Amino acid sequence: MADIVFGFGTSHSPLLSTPPNKWHLRVEADKKNPSLEYRGKSYVFDELVKLRAKESLDYQSSLPVRAERHDASQLSIVKLSEHLEKVDPDVLIIIGNDQREVFEENNTPAISMIYGENVNHLSIPPERLANMPPGIAIAAKGCSAEQDISYPIDSDLSTHIISSLTKDHFDLCAMKSLPDGPRGPRGMSHAYGFIYRRIMKKPIPAVHVCLNTFYQPNQPTASRCVALGKAIGRAVNNYNRNLRVAVCGSGGLSHFVIDEEFDQRVNQGLKTLDMNLLASLPEEYFISGTSEIKNWITTAAIVNEGGLKNSMLDYIPCYRSEAGTGNAMGFMTW
């Protein structure tokens, strides 16, 4: 039988691949954003500066603090990579999401999985890099491939999980391969690319589970993510091959406006594997990048089915402006 032997969560923010003295390049975009989401409401930049004036965010977004937290985040990534290498699983289940890299508005499945033999990880052509907004091209190296490459999918386990989820009343999109786009074949979303570029030291056969965390109207709720994770965990436990299975949640924590108070509630649920707490988190907080926490919630429910316990939690809020914009980084193992 298959065994769930290791789980981890990691942020995949562009800031993790951007030198701290370049974080300001995205602040101009923050200032132009008419809908900075914070605690269930939308703000403009100056409104957040006023609202959060007592939090010393000008200091927290200063270059020395940015550099310190960037360095701490890099150490956490190294720890995750070394831990995964030491565990050396046969398969890695990656719970991620898409931000219009694969799915477009005319077809956005709530839950999708690949069951083919491989998945593409594509490089970004120089002409596309040149046309990217300030700060994005710098960070692209953290998620995109240096050159086009294909990685193995555990097709048999993926098919088993899809069939098992269907019996558990989950209606999901099953793909032999990712859909083609206007430029031809598409590659994996950056939520997955980060794991291959920054965490894996060697290719590991994988299972890709994609959640629509970002886009209305069909995002799975937190409680549905708990149920999904439990169902995936049961499917793995009932699989009749002797496999050592690891699980990863990619994304989060709160961004693009950091909310440390909410993150601490989330982290408490993740650390203690309190499924009731995680399932009851308010949906209005899961907007924009913060919605990627649902990838972690699903992962936590899977590892809970495997009987694992929390062994590491690094929480590093990386502010880039006095409005509280940036990304709260999280790195966790079970």
Region roles according to the model:
Residues 15-18, 100-105, 254-258:
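Short catalytic/ligand-binding loop motif for oxyanion handling, primarily in non-cytosolic enzymes
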